[in-house]
Each structure stands twice: as structure tokens, then as C-alpha cells.
Amino acid sequence: MRIFNTLTRKKEEFIPITPGEVKMYVCGPTVYNFFHIGNGRTFIVFDTIRRYLEYRGYDVKFVQNFTDIDDKMIKKANEEGTTVKEIGDKYIKEYYEDADKLQIERATVNPRATEYIEDIIDFVAQLIEKGYAYEVEGDVYFNTKKFNDYGKLSGQSIEDLQMGASNRTSSVADERKKDPMDFAIWKSQKPGEPAWKCPWGMGRPGWHIECSCMAKKILGDTIDIHAGGMDLTFPHHENEVAQSEALTGVQFANYWMHSAYVNINNQKMSKSLNNFFTARDILKEYDSDVVRFFMMSAHYRLQINFSKDLLDSAKASVERLYNAIGNLENLIDEVSRENMNEEEVRYLNSLNKYREKYIEKMDDDFNTADALTVLFELTKDTNTNINVNSSKELVNKALDLIRELGAPLGLLQKITKGSLEDEIESLIQQRQDARKNKDFALSDKIRDDLKDRGIVLEDTPQGVRWKKIN
């Protein structure tokens, strides 16, 4: 398996620290609003990579944080007349709701920065003690000149970084720094801000130190994979490298991975530009399989343009795949022979070439676009060569293979007609009973839960009917 490593700017053979195990940290959302579809791409990409690593037999410890103390959160809390904690609680709940609908698996650990304040204070104190940080009137800055490798992740020279930082220096706070490139790892309290007691007075952590501390505390001094959106490469991830390696003296992460932007009209989607669509808005119109297919139709390091036309195209592609599955499932009731004959055994063995090709594509820096092509080739083959004269065993094994290769991509796992019919009919009956009892809240919940699973109900004069949607 080869991974493109941002640190070395080339593909490298993936060799985990501990054989069979992967320690992976992904920078999660700042929880002051619903996440937009650009953020969603990052979450879907690294969920897919995590799924594929598990498919290949790795035990993945997957950590994705919540930034729940930040300038944006303080601003939001002040605007709404509430507390930063209440804002964080609300949008963490909303994150889980949207992520679940996108079939994003829950992380092994979802740490909140505010749960690690004491650890962060200790981290900052050690950096001061080692001479890598200094305190000025309650603020603490990291001394970038003391860290000789500053700039190695983003590939920028010290001269370029200094020039850029000098151009940005404008505030009194900046003028107190020893160098324009120095960045805050602890911020003194301002009126109306939450704060914690520390040796430098009341204050709160800087953004960059939060991830360094949580990654170290949960995964150790050196982790296998650190990942996030491409926009985090500098300064966020660069600063994480500096802080962490200054403290421990060892490499922070062996592989750095970054997903590219989602653009609208060739401009990066972002809240600051107000050119974004929330994942929640998109999910009102498109199924999670469609959104995931759209995201994976391009390599994760390539930017993609967002448009309704492209989503509609993804929807049509997903429908083709589900139709292929549906055709096979319908055959289960039509075929009369149970077990495979010798010719079918040979044919089934020939289908292994699709699994091998799929693994070859995904092992090459998680090439999801080519992996999707393999899925289409497989479904075309099975739909051409499996028919009413085939055995039930062959039909089921072909279905198993299609779903097996869809699973790491988070695709093709929804209920289709012909499977779990008893469960659906039972839920429909429960809904009917609830309506008779005027328990419309329960009735609506059952309907919405089924819709989330890809099943839509239709109330007709002949009774309730259900069908699969994509």
C-alpha cells in the first residue's frame, strides 16, 4: 500500500509503527455551525480511508477532535446570548446527526478541546521550560526560530515565511512577538471570554496547541497518519509539527494526508466567502450514497467542482449500481437450483479478478475513482452472465462480492427490495398502529427512519406500499 505523504511530497510504502495497527488523527470541525459540503468531503474521504484500512485487516484507532473553544465560537455565543459550551453541545449533536446520515462511521475517540485544558497547560509549561515558548503579559507564543525544521511540512522556506508574516504584522499583539512568525499557544483572557486558571493568569488555549495535545495524549508521541483538509497544511499542521516535535524530540506523524477543496465556480467553498451549502441542505435532496459517490468520483488530492448537474450525474450512477443489485436479488426468487455446478465455480473464481483490481487501485493512494470503475465492471459482468438458469448460491455470492467492494466506500449497503422485507413490513404495521392511536410523532419517526435507510412509504387506497430510493 502506497500513500502520498505531504511531508515528503511523494508516494511512500505504508509501514505502520506497530504491525497490524494504525493510529490516525484527523482534524475535525470547529463546532459553531452546521458543516458545509466542503468540510463534508474531508470527513467522507478519511472515513473511506479508515474503512479501507480496516478492510485490509488493520486495527485502526481513529481520533477526530472537536474544536469547542475558539474565536468563532466566542463570537457565535455572544451573538446568540448564550455560552460557548452550549454552542459546542448544540453543534456537536448536529454534527453527529449529519455525519450519521452520510454513513460516516463514529470515531474511536472524539475528544473535545475543553476536556484537555489541564493537559494543554502542562504542554505549554513544558515548551516554556525547554525554551521553545515565551510569555508576554499573559499570552504565550511559540518561538519559531528555536525550531530549525519550521516550514518542512508545507515546503516553505524560512525567508518566504518571514516575509509573509512581516506583511501580516499590524497589531500591538504582533509587535510583542520576538519574530513575526511566532504564534500564540495560550491567549490571555479578554472581557466576555471563557478562561481557565494557569501559571500565566486566566486564559484559554490557542487553536494549534489543542490538536497537538489531544493527539499526543490519546495516540502517543508519534502517530501513523495525521490528516485534514488541504487548507490546514499551513499554518495549522505546520504549527502542530513544531510544537509537538519541540516537546518530544521525535517525529510527530509519519504520514501526512490532505484532501483537496470542493469549489463553486472554481472558487473554494467556505463560510467566510458565503458560497457554501451545508451537508444538511444537500441531504434533503440527495441520498448519502449519491453524496459519497460524488466525493469519490475524483481522487481525494484533486479539487472538485460542486454543481447540481454533477450530483444528478452521481445519482444516475448510483441508481445503475442499485439496479444491478436489484436485478440479482430478483433472481433469487426466480432460480430453481440451489448449489453451484463446476462451471459456475470457475466463473465465480474469475470474479476474483475484480477484487484484486479493486485492491490494486485502492492500495495506490486510495484511488476511489478507479475503484468505482471496477465496481461498474463487476456489476456489468454479473448482470450479463448470471440469469434464471444460474444457481441461488452463485447469485448470493455475486451479491456478496458487490457489497463487499462497496462497503469500504460506504456505498451499496442500504436495504433493497427483497432483503429484510419482514422487518420493513413490521415497521409499517407499527406505523399503522401508531396512526390509529393518533400517535403521529411515532408514525412520523418510523417513516423518517425508513427514509434515512433508503425506503420511502406511499399511502395508497390499497394500503401502504414501500419502495427503495437512491
UniProtKB/Swiss-Prot annotation:
Binds 1 zinc ion per subunit. GO terms for cellular component: cytosol. Zn(2+) binds at residues 27, 211, 236, 240. ATP binds at residue 271. Keywords: Aminoacyl-tRNA synthetase, ATP-binding, Cytoplasm, Ligase, Metal-binding, Nucleotide-binding, Protein biosynthesis, Zinc. A motif ('KMSKS' region) lies at residues 268-272. Its EC number is 6.1.1.16. It is found in: Cytoplasm. A motif ('HIGH' region) lies at residues 29-39. Its main location: cytoplasm. GO terms for molecular function: ATP binding; cysteine-tRNA ligase activity; zinc ion binding. GO terms for biological process: cysteinyl-tRNA aminoacylation. The keyword Cytoplasm applies. Its cofactor is Zn(2+). It comes from the Bacteria. It is an enzyme of class 6 (ligase). It holds the Pfam family CysS_C. SMART domains: DALR_2. It catalyses: tRNA(Cys) + L-cysteine + ATP = L-cysteinyl-tRNA(Cys) + AMP + diphosphate. HAMAP family: Cys_tRNA_synth. Monomer. Belongs to the class-I aminoacyl-tRNA synthetase family. This is Cysteine--tRNA ligase. It comes from Clostridium botulinum (strain Alaska E43 / Type E3).
